[in-house]
């Protein structure tokens, strides 16, 4: 079984960068949709595969283009997370996740993972490192127990944090995947 991290396509918050980083719930641009369509040709999704998606509009739109909504589960534990973490950094509004109520309204019928915690307000963006590590390791263990491959559609900082948890060393912002980029761990 493999685990593949996919970064969402080009988002509206990156138009006129950095002036739109405080835009709430930006979606994909036409460029972002085109990037995801190209990525779709590289993926071979199996009926047993599972797609975990950050609760933001741009990641959900990415997932819907890749999967037509099949095997897709929204999971706050793969929501936006700063990298590197710094308590003096202020989170951008573009990284605010949808509430469960907003998800039900905006994307009715999508499955939402019950993580057994109340992280729908703040998400994992500024979560304490130890708490994040405990929750993330729990999610990774859950992934290992599934039958198919796992695809996680998320954000640069989040993906980099998970890559470190999975044993990669010396990662920096230079290692971000870029728009609609992907990184696979074989035999996860």
Spell out what each predicted region is.
Residues 12-15, 59-62, 81-84, 121, ...:
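Short catalytic/ligand-binding loop motif for oxyanion handling, primarily in non-cytosolic enzymes
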Residues 3, 49, 146-156:
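Generic beta-sheet signal
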Residues 2, 6-74:
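Active-site-proximal alpha-helix that buttresses catalytic centers in soluble enzyme cores
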């Amino acid at each position: 079984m493999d685990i593949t991290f996919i970064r969402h396509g080009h988002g509206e918050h990156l138009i006129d960068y950095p002036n739109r980083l405080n835009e709430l719930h930006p979606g994909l641009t036409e460029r972002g949709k085109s990037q995801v369509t190209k990525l779709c040709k590289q993926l071979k999704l199996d009926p047993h595969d599972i797609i975990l998606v950050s609760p933001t509009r741009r990641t959900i739109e990415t997932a819907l283009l890749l999967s037509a909504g099949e095997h897709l589960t929204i999971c706050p534990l793969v929501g936006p997370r700063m990298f590197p973490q710094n308590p003096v950094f202020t989170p951008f509004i573009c990284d605010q996740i949808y509430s469960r109520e907003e998800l039900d309204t905006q994307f009715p019928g999508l499955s939402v993972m019950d993580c057994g915690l109340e992280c729908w307000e703040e998400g994992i963006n500024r979560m304490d490192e130890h708490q994040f590590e405990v929750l993330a390791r729990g999610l990774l263990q859950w992934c290992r127990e599934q039958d198919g491959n796992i695809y996680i559609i998320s954000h640069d900082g989040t993906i980099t944090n998970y890559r470190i948890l999975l044993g990669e060393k010396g990662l920096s912002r230079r290692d971000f995947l870029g728009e609609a980029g992907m990184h696979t761990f074989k035999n996860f």
